[in-house]
Amino acid sequence: MKLKFDLKKKNGNARRGQLTFERGTVQTPAFMPVGTYGTVKGMTPEEVKGTGAEILLGNTFHLWLRPGQEVMKMHGDLHDFMNWHGPILTDSGGFQVFSLGKMRTITEKGVHFRNPVNGDKIFMDAEKSMEIQKDLGSDIVMIFDECTPYPATHNEAKKSMEMSLRWAQRSRDHFDKLENPNNLFGIVQGGVYEDLRDVSVKGLTEIGFDGYAVGGLAVGEPKEDMHRILEHTCPQLPEDKPRYLMGVGKPEDLVEGVRRGIDMFDCVMPTRNARNGHLFVTGGVIKIRNAKHKTDTTPLDPHCDCYTCQNYSKSYLHHLERCNEILGARLNTIHNLRYYQRLMESIRKAIDEDRFDEFVQEFYARRDREVPPLSKA
């Protein structure tokens, strides 16, 4: 079904809302854990839900290569395959193809590349991406686009953005031809160039989508450029549609995104960092492998209500990390995912109570850092 987006409140540029799907509701601003291969690494769906997550992200490109569309359809769709019955957003595969570097060739038609699993020659285009995502049963389908690399000259970024707009129209047309009852999001491109972002927004809104993502950021550009582009782009996006910042990010990035009007985020950071023993806490990051934690009998974060913090000490987690025990990665992941969801809960509460600016000040004070300035403050 078509999602319903209720924008309940604004506090400055920060937005408080709710997404309603047939499979459930999502409170925004929202963070989506990443389940690349149909699993949030190391977690059961019940555990992921227990951290507070209401929507997951799946990866079209990787699920197309393994296990493939036919296996997916044998189960019904991705929800049935992985036993997650809340909403799922799937990316289009564009970023993964971009990440292949020299293994791929981009043309107007689409992208030719070698399958990184077995070396076979393979082709993906806007139409194929729409077909795969329909078979996945994605509640939110992303258009097929080219992620503009950084750095890129103005001319390079312009050509990339213009092709992404043409692919956006093809994605829209094929999505409609397939009679997909779910939702299609456009992706704003244009690199770090404000004039190109303007053209992209205008083109996408003329085509018309159920929501709009800001893509091509967090690809190596300075933070100041990301903030500048967000501040420039978000006010141009339709007020009544959800806004999604793709592939972002650190806790600070989520706060800064909300400050500039973003509603949805995804990133592998909480799960990947957990597996590397980097754990997010109220005051920053704990590297649990460090020797100083060997005899520390306190929990990771006294403010955290996750299963890990309620039951285990830093000393035990340090021991598991040193011994490379699988349980360590699982407990770390539970904690990091819950940290991200608690952060979003705190952000939503602050917006509800008209004290988001105060929340931002407190957030950075706990990290002993200055609040980054708004470019257009």
Swiss-Prot record:
Q: Which SUPFAM superfamilies match?
A: tRNA-guanine transglycosylase
Involved pathway(s) = tRNA modification; tRNA-queuosine biosynthesis
Quote the EC number.
2.4.2.29
Q: Which reaction does it catalyse?
A: 7-aminomethyl-7-carbaguanine + guanosine(34) in tRNA = 7-aminomethyl-7-carbaguanosine(34) in tRNA + guanine
Q: Which residues bind substrate?
A: D91, S92, G93, G94, F95, D145, Q189, G216
Q: Which InterPro entries match?
A: ArchSynthase1/Queuine_TRR, TGT, TGT-like_sf, tRNA_ribo_trans-like
What are the annotated GO cellular component locations?
cytosol
- Cofactor note from UniProt? Binds 1 zinc ion per subunit.
Give the protein's cofactors. Zn(2+)
Active-site positions, per UniProt?
Answer: D91, D266
Single Gene Ontology MF annotation: tRNA-guanosine(34) queuine transglycosylase activity
Segments for region (RNA binding): 247-253, 271-275
Its BP terms in the Gene Ontology are: queuosine biosynthetic process; tRNA wobble guanine modification; tRNA-guanine transglycosylation
Supply the alphabetized keyword list: Glycosyltransferase, Metal-binding, Queuosine biosynthesis, Transferase, tRNA processing, Zinc
Function, as annotated, reads: Catalyzes the base-exchange of a guanine (G) residue with the queuine precursor 7-aminomethyl-7-deazaguanine (PreQ1) at position 34 (anticodon wobble position) in tRNAs with GU(N) anticodons (tRNA-Asp, -Asn, -His and -Tyr). Catalysis occurs through a double-displacement mechanism. The nucleophile active site attacks the C1' of nucleotide 34 to detach the guanine base from the RNA, forming a covalent enzyme-RNA intermediate. The proton acceptor active site deprotonates the incoming PreQ1, allowing a nucleophilic attack on the C1' of the ribose to form the product.
Q: Which HAMAP family match?
A: Q_tRNA_Tgt (MF_00168)
Assembly and binders: Homodimer. Within each dimer, one monomer is responsible for RNA recognition and catalysis, while the other monomer binds to the replacement base PreQ1.
What name does this protein carry?
Queuine tRNA-ribosyltransferase
Q: Which organism is it from?
A: Vibrio parahaemolyticus serotype O3:K6 (strain RIMD 2210633)
Gene name of the record? tgt
